[in-house]
Amino acid sequence: MQSFIFFVFLIYGFFPHCQSINDGNIKINLPNQQDVIYRYTRSERGDPAEKEGSVFKLRTTVFFVVYGLLVLLAFIAFLVWRLRRSKTQEKRKNMALMNIYSDLRDTGDAMPEELKNRPLNDKLDYLPYKKQYEIASENLENKSILGSGNFGVVRKGILKMASPKNEEEKKMRLTVAVKSAANCYDISQTSMLAAELRLMCSIGRFPNVLALVGAVTSELRKGRLLIVTEYIDCGDIRKYLIDHRNVFQDHLIEDKTEPDSYLTPISAKRKNYVFKNTDENSDYVIKESLDSLTTSDLLSFGLQIANGMQYLASIPMVHRDLALRNVLLKKNKTIRIADFGMARTHENKSYYIPQKTKDAPVPVRWMSPEAFDTMKFTEKSDVWSFGICLYEIFTLGQLPYPDVPSERIYEYMHSGRRCPQPQHCHVELYDLMKLCWHEKPELRPNFSNCVEYFIGHMKKSASKLLENVDEMLRVEAENQRKLEDWIRVERSESV
């Protein structure tokens, strides 16, 4: 009531000289108090429909205003949450990268005695990063992508010499392969890459093993870790064999000097090497042209893989995924065993996911039975895989067990069945394959035995080829030694 009286006096004060207001058929004289009261009462008793409409509009307006404010507040709250979450994740990421960087730079804790004779794979946490492999980022230029997978990207790179001694060396450039994480924000990928780097540092350099040139670790705290290796220009051997099947020259033919007998089955007739080159000095010699493919090349590939695996086993180190797709080929037909890192793409159709591993694809066509059973890998399981590699070589890249589905490989192996003798394979080498595929691991040869077997076989049948391979590997060892000159900060004048 007091508010109403105040309202009346307010109007009276604002309109002291007004005479009348014409509101429809009602004439109201102001500032007569009675008239003002009458108008107020008339307004309150107005049309109910109009009053209801006004109330509805008011409620609608209030609803949308309140709803809008709530949405705005919710959006602001969401932004604040995202910002805090992002900062928390960024902080955790930076701490994780710092830990990886510190672990990589740390000389490492003393290795437990029980691990000292174990393969490198079992003691990754204790393997140091050797600082002499560090490459200044300004000396490395990344180029086109060579390949990529779920965990890593490999690019072609150009490396400048760290300490050139003259103008000629300043102009020199080395083509390299540069591996990085597929997603630099994924800590697990960076961690696996760091583990692979420590592994490669400990492996060292050997002619038939992909050599580490160096690494860029200075920007690891920003999520950037680069592994720099030799650039191998011709891809993997399996693809090369498949692509050159139509030009293959088979020098392994049936031996006509052996007496024919109806008691000797056709499948048992022996084949020997007959090299058809007319130039005596060119017999057994590997042609560096990639356009040619002969039996000599197949023998050379087999020996070189055995040679590289013998070196890895001597470290010791277990490969776990030895297959021709992981053996690279240079233009001069020397090979490099590669892909012994922790990160695997598993995009190859020859991989199969067994029930035991649930979601971890494994190369069942190359795996030994005991590795399939226990998921534990040893030199002897690698030897089994080497036998499969020989099968791939002498079938010119054919898939092992081509008629057996991946999910039935385990059953097939345990039944005692094995891959048949390839058409282009000497019987002595097939005997080696069967030894590699012995059901009992302890009865399989080791890689030193495999190298000796190969050398003995080639001495009898292709001695000049053996000399040729030895010379190629000597040159490759020297080329790998020179890789140090590209990253060494201080070089003597005699270098």
UniProtKB/Swiss-Prot annotation:
Entry-linked CDD domains: PTKc
Active site per UniProt: D321 (proton acceptor)
The keyword Signal belongs to this UniProt entry's keyword annotation: yes
Subcellular location(s) per record: Cell membrane
Binding site for ATP: L146, G147, S148, G149, N150, F151, G152, V153, V154, K179
Major location (coarse): membrane
Extracellular side, ranges: 23-60
InterPro entries: Kinase-like_dom_sf, Prot_kinase_dom, Protein_kinase_ATP_BS, RTK, Ser-Thr/Tyr_kinase_cat_dom, Tyr_kinase_AS, Tyr_kinase_cat_dom
SMART domains to which the protein is assigned, alphabetical: TyrKc
EC number in record: 2.7.10.1
Tissues/organs with expression: Hypodermal cells.
Membrane-spanning ranges: 61-81
Keywords: ATP-binding, Cell membrane, Kinase, Membrane, Nucleotide-binding, Receptor, Signal, Transferase, Transmembrane, Transmembrane helix, Tyrosine-protein kinase
Cytoplasmic side: 82-495
Domain of life: Eukaryota
Pfam families for the chain: PK_Tyr_Ser-Thr
Occurrences of domain Protein kinase (ranges): 140-455
Keyword ATP-binding: yes
Record's bilayer topology term: Single-pass membrane protein
EC supergroup of this enzyme: transferase
Signal sequence bounds: 1-22
Single GO term (MF): transmembrane receptor protein tyrosine kinase activity
PANTHER family for this protein: PROTEIN KINASE DOMAIN-CONTAINING PROTEIN-RELATED, TYROSINE-PROTEIN KINASE RECEPTOR
Family designation: Belongs to the protein kinase superfamily. Tyr protein kinase family.
Primary role: May be specifically involved in cell-cell interactions regulating cell fusions that generate the hypodermis during postembryonic development. It has a role in the development of the HYP7 hypodermal syncytium.
Protein's name in the database: Receptor-like tyrosine-protein kinase kin-16
Organism: Caenorhabditis elegans
Lineage of origin: Eukaryota, Metazoa, Ecdysozoa, Nematoda, Chromadorea
